[in-house]
Curated annotation (Swiss-Prot):
Location (main, coarse): cytoplasm
Record-listed substrate binding positions: 224
Lineage: Bacteria, Pseudomonadati, Pseudomonadota, Betaproteobacteria, Burkholderiales
InterPro entries associated with the record: Amidohydro-rel, Metal-dep_hydrolase_composite, Metal_Hydrolase, Urease_alpha_N_dom, Urease_alpha_subunit, Urease_AS, Urease_asu, Urease_asu_c
Organism (species): Bordetella bronchiseptica (strain ATCC BAA-588 / NCTC 13252 / RB50) (Alcaligenes bronchisepticus)
Name the record gives this protein: Urease subunit alpha
Broad EC category: hydrolase
Encoding gene, per UniProt annotation: ureC
Gene3D superfamilies assigned to the protein according to its UniProt record, in alphabetical order: Metal-dependent hydrolases, Urease, subunit C, domain 1
């Protein structure tokens, strides 16, 4: 029997499991170590493409017709996923969907084949690469279209939010107001290779004014204090949501003008709602909106500028608040409004509540107190900070951090998908879902993508000089690929409400994107948030702003230095 050393095997085929012990992979330059839990491939029967390799006719490639074979296979990849786990496998893609996670090859010559390779199969070499589900950003201000290229370059494949461009309302609030703007933005977003969904303006006590936006194609409604986040508007908005099975997102009343946090909670009446930037620096009842993270009907999210807590976090927030919410620093009341939202104690507690699974979702708040290209990066910086300050999570050890890794990746993949009724199509690396997949070199994990697949077709990738003789010479840049051009845009989805699908005005928009209705939004609770469903009793001292969870004070220090930072961005 021919033998190969473990290190040599990993170099050729990627990490594996031997004798029940998995190889480990460091994520970027963090302290986080992922250990392979299972290897679906078979030793000695691995498939690999290239000169003198296995995927050749009569060897690893069968003579089967296209109907029996996958369109694309990713070979020997390390999957990191909140649902599937941390596993080594071949991934089959057929008709834009993940069709298999297992062992690829030729069943006529190899044992255990579950993914058939044929003449109609393209190969993506996954050896030594990490594969994750595309990130889902549920807090997008659609201010400028260039955000989408930035998002794709950092692994985001689904963008949900609102706006109409750099209008003053859109600079502050994530809502696309009214049927006319809804139609225009759906048509504008039709030319980009990402899944999209739009929020209508939910700040109204008029049932009809909200319903007409849902019928026009809104996949959800957004309540925002700048338009009014009153108990009446909250109740009306949730009534419409219950009737139409859509999600409601809320940015509550920082100034406590129309009531305190208890009044907002009472207006929920136990109904499901997605709470944006639940810590409060991004907006919400001062100083105690963070209490929402302990409610079973609230799906609590963070936006990325407060994550993780560093020595620069407090200083940068004041200017962000002033600009985003159209405030005047020469007006004392405006300055007091901004300062009321920025609290060192609640920002520090936010890191810990994420680590313990009380906060369930991460998002960006793009160009409106958040960075569209940093949702993935800041999630892992936070996980690193928490390991550094708090040690291993329960179930982890000094050897590996699988439980923490699966908890944190859920925050920008499966949990936002579940919250907004789109988990039947996106959010995890599972059979039957869209092949919206991101490939990473481990050293660049969470920072710079190797390749982004949209329904199995490359839409963004790190590619060298296009005038060179090969694809690798410098400058290597993340560039748009064929999947982002022409009618290949049909590989993306526009998520809308179910009631809008029967509206002739929506079907007459002539969209290339496939229209898919959100579903199951109203039955979701905090218990459905994968690996992030802790429900502590949270309290905030009104004088000191100190945060307690189940009676325990939550405190951590600001970091002065982070991984995944300057060493990756010299150019």
């Amino acid at each position: 029997m021919t033998r190969i050393s473990r290190s040599a095997y990993a170099e050729i085929y990627g990490p594996t499991v031997v004798g029940g012990v998995g190889d480990r992979v460091r994520l970027a330059d963090t302290l986080l170590l992922a250990e392979v839990e299972k290897d679906h491939t078979i030793f000695g029967e691995e498939v690999k493409f290239g000169g003198g390799k296995v995927i050749r006719d009569g060897m690893g490639q069968s003579q089967r017709l296209a109907t029996d074979c996958v369109d694309t296979v990713i070979t020997n990849a390390l999957i990191i996923d909140a649902v599937t786990g941390i596993v080594k496998a071949d991934i089959g893609i057929k008709d834009g969907l993940i069709s298999g996670i297992g062992k690829a090859g030729n069943p006529d010559t190899q044992p255990g084949v579950t993914i058939i390779i044929g003449a109609s199969t393209e190969v993506v070499a996954g050896e030594g690469l990490i594969v994750t589900a595309g990130a889902i950003d549920t807090h997008i201000h659609f201010i400028c279209p260039q955000q989408i290229e930035e998002a794709l370059a950092t692994g985001t494949t689904t963008m949900i939010g609102g706006g109409t461009g750099p209008a003053t309302g859109s600079l502050a609030t994530t809502s696309t107001s009214g049927p006319w703007h809804m139609a225009a933005m759906l048509q504008a977003l039709d030319t980009f290779p990402v899944n999209v969904g739009l929020f209508g303006k939910g700040s109204s006590s008029s049932h009809g004014a909200l319903l007409e936006q849902v019928r026009a194609g809104a996949m959800g409604l957004k309540i925002h204090e700048d338009w009014a986040s009153t108990p009446a508007s909250i109740d009306t908005c949730l009534n419409v949501a219950e009737e139409t099975d859509i999600q409601v997102a809320i940015h509550s009343d920082t100034l406590n003008e129309s009531g305190f946090v208890e009044d907002t909670f009472a207006a929920f009446k136990g109904r499901t709602i997605h709470s944006f930037h639940t810590e409060g620096a991004g907006g919400g009842h001062a100083p105690d909106i963070i209490r929402a993270a302990g409610m079973p009907n609230v799906l609590p999210a963070s936006t990325n500028p407060t994550m993780p807590f560093t020595r620069n976090t407090i200083d940068e927030h004041l200017d962000m608040v002033m600009v985003c919410h159209h405030l005047d620093p020469s007006i004392a009341e405006d300055l007091a409004f901004a300062e009321s939202r920025i609290r060192r104690e609640t920002i520090a507690a936010e890191d810990i509540l994420h680590d313990l699974g009380a906060f369930s979702i991460m998002s960006s708040d793009s160009q409106a107190m958040g960075r569209v290209g940093e949702i993935v990066l800041r999630t892992w910086q936070t996980a690193h900070k928490m390991k550094l300050q708090r040690g291993p999570l329960q179930g982890d050890s000094e050897r590996s951090d699988n439980e923490r890794i699966k908890r944190y990746i859920a925050k920008y993949t499966i949990n936002p998908a579940v919250a907004h009724g789109i988990a039947h199509l996106v959010g995890s690396v599972e059979v039957g879902k869209l092949a919206d997949l991101v490939l990473w070199k481990p050293a660049f994990f969470g920072v710079k993508v190797n390749m982004v697949l949209k329904s199995g077709m490359a839409v963004s990738a790190s590619i060298g000089d296009m005038g060179a003789s090969i694809s690798t010479p410098q400058p290597v840049q993340i560039r748009p690929m064929w999947g982002s051009h022409g009618k290949a845009l049909r590989t993306s989805v526009a998520f809308v409400s179910q009631v809008s699908l029967s509206n002739p005005a929506v079907s007459e928009l002539g969209l290339n994107k496939r229209l898919e209705a959100v579903r199951g939004c109203r039955g979701v609770t905090k218990h459905d948030m994968v690996r992030n469903n802790w429900l502590p009793a949270i309290s905030v001292d009104p004088q000191t702003y100190q945060v307690y969870a189940d009676g325990q004070l939550l405190r951590c220090e600001a970091l002065a230095e982070l991984p995944m930072a300057q060493r990756y961005f010299l150019f």
